[in-house]
A protein has these predicted regions:
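Conserved AMP-binding/adenylate-forming core of the ANL superfamily
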Residues: 35-36, 55-86, 92-100, 104-108, ...
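Conserved structural elements of the adenylate-forming
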Residues: 72-77, 205-211, 222, 241-261, ...
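AMP-binding/adenylate-forming catalytic core of the ANL superfamily
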Residues: 124, 131, 141-143, 317, ...
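AMP-binding/adenylate-forming catalytic domain of the ANL superfamily
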Residues: 166, 547-572, 590-593
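Conserved pre-ATP/AMP-binding loop-to-beta segment of ANL
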Residues: 189-230, 237, 260-267
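Conserved AMP-binding/adenylation subdomain of ANL enzymes
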Residues: 249-267, 275-316, 330
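Gly/Ser/Thr-rich phosphate-binding loop
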Residues: 314-319, 328-395, 406
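Conserved beta-loop-beta connector loops within the AMP-binding
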Residues: 408-427, 450, 466-469, 532-538, ...
C-alpha cells in the first residue's frame, strides 16, 4: 500500500482556539500563522526568490561553497535523476547518510517530485537497516559508501531495486578528495563501478540530465507526507513518524518569528544529524529559509570544537547538552573569541539551571553577547515546540510555546488540565504535530487524542508544569527511555538483544550519568546456572549488541548478579536498580552516611 493511501490525521487548523497564557509575548498575526499549501521544496524556493539571496552561500562543506543558485540547480538535476530511475509521487526512498550535500540535495529533490524521504542513521546495525528498508517498502536507497559492507548482505531481502552510492569525499575540494582517499577512502569496501544494482552519485546525476519524459515537479499539498523520521517510542519498537510538508513549513515560519534577528549574513554549524528532526528542520531547513549559510559537519569530534569555531565563526549554535558540555570543557577553547555568536539553542534533553548558568558564563567570558536558550520538542512535532525567550529569558525553563503551537498540562491519562505550577503530562496542539505513525493506527491513536475542545492533541509522555505566564518547566520522562548525546536509547530493545545470549536468564537496562553524554546505558545481567562472568562472555555480549544495535545504544557497563530484583507481580524492578545505582554513586562521591 502506498503511503498516500494510508489513513492519517489532518491537523492543519483548529476547531476551537485553546487558551494561551503566553499570547502577550506575540502579536495577533504571529499567533495565527498561515501555513501555505505547498511543498517544503517550493516553500524554500519561494523564500530564496523573495529574499533575493540566490548568490549567497547555502551550503559549505570542507571549504566547498555551494550558492543557493547552484543548490537549486543541483536539486533540479537530482529530481530528474530520480524520475529517470522510476521514482514517482508517494514512493519511499531511504537516505542512509551523515550530513553531506548529496544527502540534503536528495532530500529536497525527492520532496520536489512528491516522493517521501525516509531518513535513517548510517551507523545503524545491519538488522536495523534491513527492517527500515522492509517496513517502509523502500523503492530506492541513497547510501554512504561506508554502509556498503552492511547493505550488500540485506538488499536481496528488500524491495530496493537501485542503490545510489555517495561518499564523504564527493563534494570535497580536489586536494582534500585525494587526501581522504589516501588516508581513509581506500579502507572502505565499495561496490564495483558497473554493477546493475548500484550507481555512483555522479553517474546517477548524469542519468537525469537529459530526462524530459514528463514534468519533474509535482503539485504537492501541505498535508501530503514528506518525510519519515524515527522514534522507538516507550517500548523501543521502531516507529516511523510521518511528517507532512505543512509540518515542516509551519516549523520554519515559527522559527522565523521567534529567531527574527537571523539574517542572510548568519551561519550555523550543522552538527546535529539530518536523520534527526532537530538537525533536518532546525539546522538545515530553518536556517536556509533565512538565506543563511549551513556549514555541514558530517562527523563531530568534541576535541576539535575549538578549530571549527575558529575557522567558521558561526553566529548560530544549535545542539544537544553534550555539545555545550564539550564547549566548556575543551581546554583549547581558552583563547577562542566567540563575539560572533548571536543565538545558542539547546534541545534534545534538559539542562539544569546551574549548568545553563555555567555555559552562559563561559559564553560571556569569551565575548559572546548571547545566552543559551533551552527548548523542548519531539520528533512527533518535527522538532522544537517551545523555547526560552531571548528578551524575556527564564533560565531553567523550556520557555513558551512557539506561535500557533498550544501546550497544556493535563492529569496523565486524561485531557483534564491541571492548575498553575502543577505537574502533569505535557500535551501539544498545532500545525507541526505529525500526521501519525507509518502504518500503525494503534500507536497513532495512543499518541494523538481528540480533547473536549475538538482539537487533536499529541500526548508527550513527559511531565512538566506551566506558570501563570505560560513558561514551562520540564520535570522528567514518564517514558522509560535513556537519552544519550541527544539520541533516544530504549532499554527494552537492548534487553531483548542481550537475552538472546544462551548464558543470560534475566537482563535489565537503565540509564546512568555520564559527564559528556548525559546518560549511557548500563546492563544488569543474571546468568543461568553454570555460567560465570568472564572476559570472553563480556566480549560475546558486546559483539551481539554491535550486530543488532546502533553504536549509541550499546551498554557502556555490564554488571552481573545472581538474580535481579523483582516487583510484586514478578517483573524485573528496574526502578530498584536505578535507586541502587544512584545510592552507590552518591556513596562514591560523598562517602557512607
Amino acid at each position: 500500500m502506498s503511503i498516500l493511501d494510508m489513513k492519517f490525521w489532518s491537523l492543519i487548523g483548529l476547531k476551537k482556539k485553546p487558551k494561551a497564557r503566553w499570547s502577550k509575548y506575540y502579536s495577533k498575526k504571529e499567533m495565527n500563522i498561515d501555513v501555505p499549501n505547498i511543498s517544503i521544496y517550493q516553500f524554500l524556493k519561494n523564500k530564496s526568490i523573495e529574499g533575493n539571496f540566490k548568490d549567497n552561500t547555502a551550503l559549505e562543506y570542507f571549504g566547498t561553497k555551494i550558492s543557493f543558485t547552484e543548490f537549486f540547480r543541483s536539486i533540479d538535476k537530482c529530481a530528474r535523476a530520480f524520475r529517470s530511475q522510476g521514482v514517482r509521487k508517494g514512493d519511499v526512498v531511504t537516505i542512509l547518510s551523515a550530513n553531506t550535500p548529496e544527502a540534503i540535495i536528495s532530500f529536497y529533490a525527492l520532496n520536489k517530485i512528491g516522493a517521501v524521504a525516509n531518513m535513517v542513521h548510517p551507523l545503524s546495525a545491519e538488522n536495523e537497516i534491513k527492517e527500515a528498508l522492509q517496513r517502509y517498502s523502500t523503492a530506492m536507497l541513497v547510501a554512504m559508501d561506508i554502509t556498503y559492507s552492511k547493505i550488500k548482505n540485506i538488499l536481496d531481502e528488500t524491495e530496493v531495486y537501485k542503490t545510489i552510492i555517495i561518499s564523504a569525499r564527493d563534494s570535497m575540494p580536489l586536494f582534500m578528495k585525494i587526501g581522504y582517499e589516501v588516508t581513509q577512502g581506500y579502507k572502505v569496501e565499495k561496490p564495483k563501478k558497473y554493477n546493475k544494482d548500484y550507481m555512483y552519485w555522479n553517474d546517477f546525476i548524469k542519468q537525469g540530465e537529459n530526462y524530459t519524459k514528463d514534468k519533474v515537479a509535482e503539485i504537492t499539498k501541505r498535508d501530503t507526507p514528506a518525510v519519515i523520521l524515527h522514534s522507538g517510542g516507550t517500548t523501543g519498537t521502531p516507529k516511523g513518524i510521518v511528517l507532512s510538508n505543512g509540518n515542516f513549513n509551519a516549523a520554519t515560519i515559527q522559527a522565523q518569528t521567534v529567531m527574527n534577528m537571523v539574517t542572510r549574513e548568519d551561519s550555523v554549524l550543522a552538527i546535529m544529524p539530518i536523520f534527526h528532526g532537530f538537525g533536518l528542520s532546525v539546522s538545515i531547513n530553518d536556517v536556509l529559509s533565512f538565506g543563511a549559510k549551513v556549514v555541514l559537519i558530517p562527523t563531530f569530534k568534541a576535541s576539535e570544537f575549538d578549530k571549527l569555531l575558529t575557522k567558521h565563526k558561526p553566529s548560530i549554535l544549535v545542539g544537544v547538552p553534550t555539545l555545550f558540555e564539550a564547549l566548556t570543557t575543551n581546554e583549547r577553547m581558552k583563547d577562542v573569541n566567540l563575539s560572533n555568536i548571536k543565538y545558542v539553542v539547546s534541545g534534545g534533553d534538559t539542562l539544569s539551571k546551574a549548568r545553563i548558568t555555567k555555559i552562559n558564563e563561559f559564553l560571556h567570558n569569551h565575548g559572546a553577547n548571547a545566552n543559551l536558550l533551552q527548548g523542548y520538542g519531539m520528533t512527533e512535532a518535527v522538532a522544537a515546540v517551545c523555547l526560552d525567550q531571548p528578551v524575556a529569558s527564564r533560565p531553567g525553563t523550556i520557555g513558551i510555546p512557539f506561535p500557533s503551537n498550544y501546550i497544556k498540562i493535563v492529569k496523565p491519562g486524561t485531557d483534564e488540565e491541571v492548575g498553575i505550577d502543577e505537574d502533569g503530562e505535557l500535551c501539544i496542539c498545532g500545525p507541526t504535530v505529525m500526521l501519525g505513525y507509518y502504518n500503525n493506527e494503534k500507536e497513532t491513536n495512543e499518541a494523538l487524542h481528540i480533547h473536549k475542545d475538538g482539537n487533536v492533541w499529541l500526548h508527550s509522555g513527559d511531565i512538566a508544569s506551566m506558570d501563570k505566564d505560560g513558561y514551562i518547566t520540564y520535570k522528567q520522562r514518564l517514558k522509560r527511555m535513556i537519552v544519550t548525546s541527544g539520541y533516544n536509547v530504549y532499554p527494552s530493545q537492548i534487553e531483548e538483544v542481550i537475552e538472546k545470549h544462551e548464558a543470560v536468564v534475566d537482563c535489565s537496562v537503565i540509564g546512568v550519568p555520564h559527564p559528556y553524554k548525559v546518560e549511557v546505558a548500563k546492563a544488569y545481567i543474571a546468568l543461568k546456572a553454570g555460567y560465570k562472568d568472564t572476559p570472553k562472555l563480556r566480549e560475546e555480549l558486546t559483539e551481539l549488541c554491535k550486530k543488532n544495535l546502533a553504536a549509541y545504544s550499546i551498554p557502556k557497563e555490564f554488571e552481573f548478579r545472581k538474580s535481579l530484583p523483582k516487583t510484586m507481580i514478578g517483573k524485573v524492578d528496574f526502578r530498584k536498580l536505578q535507586q541502587e545505582n544512584a545510592e552507590a554513586r552518591a556513596e562514591e562521591r560523598y562517602g557512607k552516611k
